[in-house]
């Protein structure tokens, strides 16, 4: 169960915006209607909440920022402008709605009244059963199970339809709210400084169906408080909802940028379920040169990364099936000491290549590395020669098929050795691929490195790669490449 905390105040425009969502529920009165037929009851309700000093500010709960957040089994901690605290618990699967209130208990009845009027404005009847224009009364008001279920269902439907974008129009007078929505709920410090605010802008599409952040913010960071909910794009600084981010293969919804993935996630999307067999999982570094930095000993640093990632080293190797085709695969993990290549990484990859050579298996190595590991000195540099030697026997002597996949970043000794030795070299979109980094080149040669000159698209034009393949297409492309080179599925059900 997750707990979300909100502390905000919505203006009339924001509440009009959230009421505008009721179009999907066939609301008879639309706030944006220009024919003069706006719903007077809604306007009165807005005016009453904005002007009243004693109101409970229900809009804190049901405003635009929260309407997208009604996910199963969540607790909302709400504070109104009067300092009252409310704990609202939703469990959609088990159909539970509970409210814990500090102080005035009238909040519950006010909440029910609002939800009822919001839910079915086109089905309103007075107590005597005759039709009326009184939108505060609803036939489902006292059927709370019906009200909650329908309201929450509509919220989730809108949420999924927009894929966590903010729907509908935002008026010019609510620009300040638009900015504060991001800063209050997601960003650290509860707001942006003056410099950031000047470069911040919000645009909506012609039909008002998307909410985009334009501009880049160097100091626009997600606070640790909300890091479990959102992932910020490194390219456009847009926010991606974490629950759906893995299903989207860590591709930014705003700009399509490919963010970093862990080795386990890459194995999951490439290898058929139930076919993964890891190799050499117990192989760990023994600190061969007894490297000690001023910050912490090398072995302590290794231990901390092992606890952080759940891995023993910066690469996972093993055997599996890709669409029924048996393969040997190694996947580097940048989260483990920057994917640096030490003696253990070199030994695991060498053993993997030798196993593939003896078993006549196609080979895939997914590269994500900052290069050789400086804490192991020349031993890490020797891994380049050792892996290249094993690769030569695999490719030149045995005539087997090796596919190298370069992800961001692939630099240093990995680029200079097995990363660029594949029979087919595939790069991910926007991947940063280089031998020496931009800063190192500029400081060494005193020359400016052009922007984008070390990205996959530019290098592809220069002939360094064979393909640039997005993640969602990668498994299918690899399967076709293997079949083209004579490797077919063991299971006939995979053969089309």
Curated annotation (Swiss-Prot):
> Its domain of life?
Eukaryota
Supply one GO BP term: malonyl-CoA biosynthetic process
Which cofactor is recorded for it? Zn(2+)
Please give the SUPFAM superfamilies that the UniProt record associates with this protein: ClpP/crotonase
Cofactor annotation remark = Binds 1 zinc ion per subunit.
Tell me the keywords, alphabetical order.
Answer: ATP-binding, Chloroplast, Fatty acid biosynthesis, Fatty acid metabolism, Lipid biosynthesis, Lipid metabolism, Metal-binding, Nucleotide-binding, Plastid, Transferase, Zinc, Zinc-finger
Chaperone as a keyword of this entry, yes or no, is: no
> Quick check: keyword tRNA processing in the entry?
no
Question: Catalyzes what?
Answer: N(6)-carboxybiotinyl-L-lysyl-[protein] + acetyl-CoA = N(6)-biotinyl-L-lysyl-[protein] + malonyl-CoA
Q: Which Gene Ontology cellular component terms are annotated? A: acetyl-CoA carboxylase complex; chloroplast stroma
Q: What is its main location?
A: plastid
Fetch the Pfam families from UniProt.
Carboxyl_trans (PF01039)
Single GO MF annotation:
ATP binding
The record's section on PANTHER family has: ACETYL-COENZYME A CARBOXYLASE CARBOXYL TRANSFERASE SUBUNIT BETA, CHLOROPLASTIC (PTHR42995:SF5)
Q: Which family does it belong to?
A: Belongs to the AccD/PCCB family.
Per the entry, what this protein does is: Component of the acetyl coenzyme A carboxylase (ACC) complex. Biotin carboxylase (BC) catalyzes the carboxylation of biotin on its carrier protein (BCCP) and then the CO(2) group is transferred by the transcarboxylase to acetyl-CoA to form malonyl-CoA.
Q: State the protein's name.
A: Acetyl-coenzyme A carboxylase carboxyl transferase subunit beta, chloroplastic
Taxonomic lineage of the native organism? Eukaryota, Viridiplantae, Streptophyta, Embryophyta, Tracheophyta
């Amino acid at each position: 169960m997750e707990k979300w905390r909100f502390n905000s105040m919505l203006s009339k425009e924001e509440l009009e915006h959230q009421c505008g969502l009721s179009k999907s529920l066939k609301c008879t009165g639309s706030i944006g209607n220009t024919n003069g037929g706006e719903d007077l009851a809604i306007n009165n309700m807005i005016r009453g909440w904005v002007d009243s000093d004693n109101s409970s500010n229900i809009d804190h709960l049901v405003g635009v920022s929260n309407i997208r957040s009604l996910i199963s089994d969540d607790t909302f901690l709400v504070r109104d402008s009067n300092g009252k605290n409310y704990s609202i618990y939703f469990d959609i699967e088990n159909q539970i709605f509970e409210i814990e209130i500090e102080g005035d208990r009238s909040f519950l009845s006010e909440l029910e009244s609002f939800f009822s009027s919001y839910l079915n404005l086109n089905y309103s009847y007075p107590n005597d059963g005759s039709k009326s224009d009184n939108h505060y009364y609803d036939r489902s008001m006292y059927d709370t199970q019906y009200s909650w279920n329908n309201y929450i269902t509509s919220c989730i439907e809108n949420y999924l339809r927009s894929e966590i974008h903010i729907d509908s129009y935002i008026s010019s007078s609510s620009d300040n709210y638009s900015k504060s929505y991001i800063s209050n709920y997601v960003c650290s410090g509860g707001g942006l400084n003056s410099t950031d605010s000047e470069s911040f802008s919000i645009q909506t599409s012609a039909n008002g169906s998307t909410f985009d952040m334009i501009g880049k913010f160097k100091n626009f960071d997600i606070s640790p408080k909300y890091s479990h909910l959102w992932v910020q794009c490194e390219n456009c600084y847009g926010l991606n909802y974490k629950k759906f981010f893995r299903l989207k293969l860590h591709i930014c919804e705003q700009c399509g940028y490919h963010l970093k993935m862990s080795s386990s996630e890459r194995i999951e999307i490439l290898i058929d379920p139930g076919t993964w067999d890891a190799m050499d999982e117990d192989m760990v570094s023994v600190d061969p040169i007894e490297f000690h930095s001023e910050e912490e000993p090398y072995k302590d640093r290794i231990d901390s990364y092992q606890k952080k990632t759940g891995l023993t080293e910066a690469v996972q190797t093993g055997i599996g099936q890709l669409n029924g085709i048996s393969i040997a695969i190694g996947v580097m993990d940048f989260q483990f000491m920057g994917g640096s290549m030490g003696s253990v990484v070199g030994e695991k990859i060498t053993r993997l290549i030798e196993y593939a050579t003896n078993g006549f298996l196609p080979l895939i190595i997914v590269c994500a590395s900052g290069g050789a590991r400086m804490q192991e000195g020349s031993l890490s540099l020797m891994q380049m020669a050792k892996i290249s030697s094993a690769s030569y026997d695999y490719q030149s002597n045995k005539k087997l098929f090796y596919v190298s996949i370069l992800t961001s970043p692939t630099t240093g000794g990995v680029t200079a050795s097995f990363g660029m030795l594949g029979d087919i070299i595939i790069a991910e979109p926007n991947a940063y691929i280089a031998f020496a980094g931009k800063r190192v080149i500029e400081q060494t040669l005193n020359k400016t490195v052009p922007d984008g000159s070390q990205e996959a698209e530019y290098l592809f034009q220069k002939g360094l790669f064979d393909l640039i393949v997005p993640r969602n297409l990668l498994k299918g492309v690899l399967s076709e490449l293997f079949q083209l080179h004579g490797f077919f599925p063991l299971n006939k059900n995979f053969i089309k």
